[in-house]
């Protein structure tokens, strides 16, 4: 099957959406499908305001239309609500062909945190974007329910996975040269240093040991100045990041707006338990068993979650991560695709 994947988030960007799409493409190609990714690197771009490292396509509609005409795909999936997403949406509507979309990021929460834009405005815009979609893929049941309550339709559950080979299990936290001889326990945060990540909830925790942060973002300079005792590592290659996960005693997800939170799965695959708030992504990833989280701890008080997660055996974190696989996620994705005009081919071209 020929699939056109249109996305504003792609390499060399570093974020969970890019990771998800790269893994998806790899799995689809391994099944024999032909995937054509249309991304900002194929167009003239401009930096995204306030988000260094993210470039957005400009004046792309004509070229994008030509690409899709030339590809003649069996299915079109629009992964993001950026400029390329809107252009692909317009193309499909004009051609009267069906397409699917995905909801990866709570942009209304980001705009609200950074610029105080009312949440209702942001969700009205996204509801309009996804309205003509034949299937809106969402990563968790919590997000699905939230979008349903906000008037989104044609919602489809699409979970994610983790590379269990890359993020290898370690029974005990390892020693990593980037971390030196740090006071234990080592608490790790991985993510963009931006408003919506709520990172200061992590940095302000009164905990023993050392805090380590991997990531860059618009708040980076001010945070480094205000929290000099934190070990700041910047962005790391994924193979290096896997080793840092393995060296941590626990992982802290301070964000309250994660739709999924792949970084949690990556940490847990290495055996590092997670402390997080009981919100959409963490509730899905950590799950609940008799009221207790699996592979970590959830609590409205992040400090309480931190202490509880520290007591979680590393093998329990690994076991929970194994529930999620990219193979399963890819099967779900294929089930949710819709043909542009007629019946989809059953297998690869």
Where are these regions (language model features)?
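Aromatic "clamp/platform" in nucleotide-sugar-dependent glycosyltransferases that forms part
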Residues: 256
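Nucleotide-activated donor-binding/catalytic signature segment of Leloir-type glycosyltransferases, i.e.
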Residues: 221-239
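Short hydrophobic beta-strand element within catalytic cores of glycosyltransferases
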Residues: 273-276
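A charged, aromatic-enriched C-terminal amphipathic alpha-helix characteristic of glycosyltransferases
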Residues: 311-345
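Donor nucleotide-sugar binding/catalytic pocket of nucleotide-sugar-dependent glycosyltransferases
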Residues: 124-172
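Conserved donor-binding/catalytic core segment of Leloir-type glycosyltransferases
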Residues: 175-212
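Short alpha-helical donor nucleotide-sugar binding micro-motif in glycosyltransferases
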Residues: 68, 130, 243-248, 333
